[in-house]
Amino acid sequence: MLARATTHALVGLEPRRVEVEAHLQPGVPGFAIVGLVDRACQEAKHRVRSGVVSAALEWPLNRRITVNLAPAALRKEGSGFDLPISLAVLGATRQLPPEHGV
């Protein structure tokens, strides 16, 4: 299952659009974030999981979660991607209704 969310990263004072794609597939459980991310973004996997569970929502068990932050050439820094990552994961698990045509 695949779900997308859109956010922005600041490059200097310029906002740059970032697409957050969460892909869930059966297999060995894991959580990977790809797309030129710094350490704070890599640690988002722990914050996102804690937030989802704390909100009494279901965390996908027995699934491999891959989150892609695109464009890959743009460096993503900080914890500002936690919410869009959470929304993309929840969308991929169908816990959020899909939205069309934004």
PLM region descriptions:
Residues M1-V102:
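Peripheral, non-AAA+ core regions of ATP-driven protein-machinery
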